[in-house]
Amino acid sequence: MDKVVPEGLWPWYAKHPEENALFNAAMVGKAHGQVAAVTAAYDFSPFGTIGDIGGGRGHLLQAVLKATPGATGVLFDQPHVIAESAGLASKRLTLQSGDFFKDALPACDAYLVMEVIHDWNDQESIAILRAIRKAAPRHAKLLLIEELIPDDPGPHWSKTLDILMLSLLGGAQRTRQEYAALFKAAGFSLVRVVDTGGISILEAVPV
């Protein structure tokens, strides 16, 4: 991929709005079933403010807010992605653009991070998680939503996805233990894993 897109896939999308819009639309379509499973499996009602970090067009955050009438949300993504989502802004949903490697993230009671960390290598993933940890109040929860590689050595879709993420972005799908190690390096502790029937919610807290 480096030979095809030397500057990296995400900077390339930032310069190609039509392709970026197509990609974001595809992500919304792909995640439809996953989002429904997440909102059915997890109780978001304890949270007042919910941040969606790298949340694209906000499909997950919108569904969570619909299921949690008392909550407000902050959608954080790159400027060109947030520009596509301008119509989502409301009294309950705030838009914030930036770079999670450089810019301050919002202070929230819970942080949704859905299929973001698998885009990055371990060092980059820890940097993203540390940025969240820096912004997170002591009582906050991190809700990382990813396809886990199971301990079973047999065939599994996540292993195919692992190869795809490595070839496209230098990223990785990971096991529960590997995510726990990333959390520890970033100042979080894994509390539990909620299986939604496919994708998993890894709940972590600041330490």
Name the predicted role of every residue range.
Residues 1-49:
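Conserved Class I S-adenosyl-L-methionine-dependent methyltransferase catalytic core
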Residues 39-40, 44-207:
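Alpha-helical subdomain
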